[in-house]
């Protein structure tokens, strides 16, 4: 380029803050590539604020991680940076991202992988069984539909370890950034068809993260809701050790009703909470459209190693403001371990 250091969106700076401005699109399959940096050779300071776009960023915080093979790890990251084409708000509220916030868009002219860092990575269309490698992102994308990769292929052993139903399905896509794995399995969530739907229903023009698979063939599965207000949202996880987790999700209307009921029964409240103070729906913000669905708690429902010793309380619990912003995090002892404050004039902007 110009002899200056290059970086792309999502890379970490010297002082620990990730770059959140710059090109979020990388074309894979083109004869040449372009690397963008926020400010080649420039000075940066301030933690956790990125001084260039003025965005506050928090690196990943892990709320849940039990030991074992291919465990379910629940973490979250925050950035106040708002893109011009934001993805829908996730289950932690505006500005927050979870590891499962990954989607692959299927278009006539190509594939777009939206990762959990807000980037859009472009690939050429793939035939069944075809694989492509992004040198700039160090990432493989492979379409299912092939029993084995050619001998000597970088992914031959990792591909062969996948269960046959995953390897042979041309409707599944898999991504990985290492020949050692794991795979991100990109499929679609089942849903209950409506009375007006034509059957069989066509597959959606996108794929969502439905699970992980490691080089030993073990899988982690995300279960998504098939009907109702939570359609498409993750409500259950089974990890590589066979443990089953239940993710309790709430809607904005449910949280508003609970808050109003609590205010009526509280001796500290002189008047009931009004609908305007805690609305039943959330307007769209600069962070994207918002269905108002939030993760409330995570329960361990089954553990093959300790079937009779399940915890009587959730492993982690979350509370939210009336604007749907993540307010506090509580551990399994119901101790508050994190709390957050936001700008009242700008929903989702942490202060």
Each model region followed by its residue ranges:
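Generic recognition of flexible, low-complexity loop/linker segments
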Residues: 60-62, 100-101, 315, 327
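N-terminal targeting and processing segments
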Residues: 76-77, 98-101, 133
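Intrinsically disordered, low-complexity proline/glycine-rich segments
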Residues: 1-49, 306, 313-318, 337
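Short alpha-helical segments and helix-capping/turn motifs at coil-helix boundaries
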Residues: 56-61, 97-99, 105-109
């Amino acid at each position: 380029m110009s002899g200056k250091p290059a970086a792309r969106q999502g890379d970490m700076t010297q002082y620990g803050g990730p770059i959140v401005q710059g090109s979020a699109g990388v074309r894979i399959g083109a004869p040449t590539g372009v690397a963008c940096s926020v400010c080649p050779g420039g000075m940066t300071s301030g933690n956790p604020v990125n001084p260039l776009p003025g965005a506050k960023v928090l690196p990943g915080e892990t709320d849940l991680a039990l030991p074992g093979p291919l465990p379910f790890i629940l973490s979250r990251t925050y950035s106040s940076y708002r893109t011009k084409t934001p993805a829908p708000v996730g289950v932690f509220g505006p500005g927050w991202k979870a590891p499962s916030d990954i989607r692959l868009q299927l278009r006539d002219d190509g594939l777009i992988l939206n990762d959990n860092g807000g980037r859009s990575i472009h690939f050429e269309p793939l035939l069944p069984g075809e694989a492509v490698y992004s040198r700039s992102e160090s990432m493989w994308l492979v379409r299912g539909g092939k029993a084995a990769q050619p001998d000597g292929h970088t992914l031959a052993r990792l591909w062969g370890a996948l269960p046959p139903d995953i390897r042979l399905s041309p409707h599944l896509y898999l991504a990985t950034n290492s020949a050692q794995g794991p795979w991100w399995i990109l499929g679609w969530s089942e849903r209950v068809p409506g009375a007006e739907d034509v059957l069989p229903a066509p597959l959606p023009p996108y794929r969502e993260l439905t699970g992980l698979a490691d080089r030993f063939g073990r899988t982690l599965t995300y279960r998504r809701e098939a009907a109702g207000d939570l359609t498409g949202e993750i409500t259950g996880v089974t990890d590589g050790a066979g443990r089953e987790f239940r993710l309790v999700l709430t809607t904005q209307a449910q949280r508003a009703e609970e808050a109003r009921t609590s205010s009526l029964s509280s001796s500290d409240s002189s008047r009931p909470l009004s609908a305007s103070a805690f609305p039943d729906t959330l307007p769209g913000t600069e962070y994207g459209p918002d269905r108002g669905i939030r993760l409330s708690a995570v329960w361990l429902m089954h553990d093959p190693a300790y079937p009779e010793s399940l915890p009587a309380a959730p492993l982690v619990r979350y509370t939210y403001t009336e604007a749907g912003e993540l307010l506090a995090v509580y551990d399994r002892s119901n101790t508050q371990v994190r709390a957050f404050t936001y700008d009242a004039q700008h929903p989702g902007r942490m202060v």
